[in-house]
């Protein structure tokens, strides 16, 4: 796994270490190392990390992985992949915190534009291009698993921006949304996720993510277009594929009704 990692080392709660001889991941790393050497390439060892996804509270088996027999790979709690912070507990508060911080760090653009006499339209375009775009980065990955607190914190970014843009004319967030013909960030993220799901559903390469429901048994309930993804845990139920499946199923059912 490559990316920008959190430097903190994961605590060994139980002291269990996976024997390298029984570690299939080590076999894959060895194959990758041999492939790189054969093709005269080099693995960036500083950016290669290990992340353990384990929800057990009693056993914490850490894989002891090495490259070139002399470099042990660091085990991390979180890592940044393509701009998104992924945690080993599959929660998104670190990623949400990063997004909000970036958005507020650009709020000075609006204040400076206002200071130098920019009109509402110019400030609004700046907000859309420079701030809102950041708040939506890779949202199909994490939107389904946001907590209510995270949803509110993200929405506050747009509330603040519209208040700055409207200035003395600002009365309420609802009025500002109506004035600019905007949807809330929550509604917009859901729309973006649905758009992504529809594109994936229509793409032959990714359509297998959303298998069609071929059940022919007649019931009183409306037949779902896609096979629902079953989950034993709420954590998995809020992960990308089950979340996008439910969004797309709901969308297709609405189309059938019309």
Regions found by a protein language model. Name each.
Residues 1-16:
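Active-site palm subdomain of RNA-directed nucleic acid polymerases
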Residues 1-4, 128, 240:
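Conserved pre-motif C helix in the palm subdomain of viral-like polymerases
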Residues 12-37, 55:
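Catalytic palm subdomain of template-directed nucleic-acid polymerases
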Residues 25, 29, 43, 96, ...:
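Hydrophobic packing residues in well-ordered alpha-helices of helical domains and bundles
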Residues 27, 34, 42-77:
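Short, conserved micro-motifs composed of acidic
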Residues 72-141:
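Basic, alpha-helical interaction scaffolds
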Residues 111-124, 141-149, 173-184:
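Acidic, serine/threonine- and proline-rich low-complexity regulatory regions
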Residues 147-258:
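Short linear motifs embedded in intrinsically disordered, charge-biased segments
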């Amino acid at each position: 796994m490559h990316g920008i990692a959190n430097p903190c080392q994961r605590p060994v709660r139980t002291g269990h270490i996976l024997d390298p001889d029984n570690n299939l991941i080590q076999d894959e790393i060895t194959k990758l190392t041999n492939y790189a050497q054969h093709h005269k390439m080099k693995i960036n060892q500083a950016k290669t990390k290990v992340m353990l996804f384990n929800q057990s509270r009693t056993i914490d088996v850490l894989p002891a992985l090495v490259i070139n027999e002399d470099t042990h790979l660091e085990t991390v709690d979180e890592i940044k992949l393509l701009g998104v912070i992924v945690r080993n507990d599959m929660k998104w508060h670190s990623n949400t915190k990063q997004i909000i911080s970036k958005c507020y760090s650009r709020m000075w653009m609006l204040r400076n534009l206002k200071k130098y006499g920019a009109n509402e339209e110019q400030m609004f375009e700046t907000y859309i291009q420079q701030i809102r775009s950041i708040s939506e980065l890779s949202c199909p990955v994490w939107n389904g698993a946001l907590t209510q607190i995270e949803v509110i914190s993200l929405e506050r970014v747009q509330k603040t921006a519209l208040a700055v843009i409207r200035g003395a004319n600002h009365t309420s967030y609802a009025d500002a949304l109506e004035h600019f013909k905007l949807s809330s960030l929550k509604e917009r993220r859901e729309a973006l996720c649905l758009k992504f799901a529809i594109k994936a559903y229509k793409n032959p390469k990714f359509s297998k993510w959303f298998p069609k429901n071929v059940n022919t048994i007649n019931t009183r309930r409306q037949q779902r277009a896609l096979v629902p993804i079953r989950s034993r845990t709420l954590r998995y139920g809020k992960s990308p594929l089950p979340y996008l499946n439910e969004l797309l199923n709901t969308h297709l059912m609405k189309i059938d009704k019309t």
